[in-house]
Amino acid sequence: MFTRLGSERGAAAVEFALVVPVLLLLLLGIIEFGRAYNTQIELSGAAREAARVMAVRNDATAAKAAAQAAAPSLNPALTTGQITIGLSNGSSCAANASTTYPVVTVTAAYPLKFLTGMFGSTITITGKSSMQCGG
């Protein structure tokens, strides 16, 4: 038959030591993905709010301030330099001679720093929104 060559004492500890690094990598990957996904949702909401303010008030400064206010959990905070506002007619939200209202597009780009460094040091995450001017 078969005989025991030695005690199996401590085998569970060895198996645990082999599995723990894999489980920790999986856990840290889930945490990093969750942070990145949350940041993208926050940026999309901030861009949507800025597009709404720009479409109604035709004020780029107020639109950028609205985007910053709509993303309070970003740390460090979203800056005005990370927010770009574009208009389909290139100038303002005012209607042109044919009474067609332009479309405003707001893009917010944010450099997210990873906590663990497993995926590099930073990644740029973007939120984008478009609305027709005219309220």
Model-derived regions, located:
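Alpha-helical assembly-interface signal, strongest on the long, hydrophobic N-terminal helix that forms
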Residues: 1-71
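Short, conserved structural patches
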Residues: 45-135
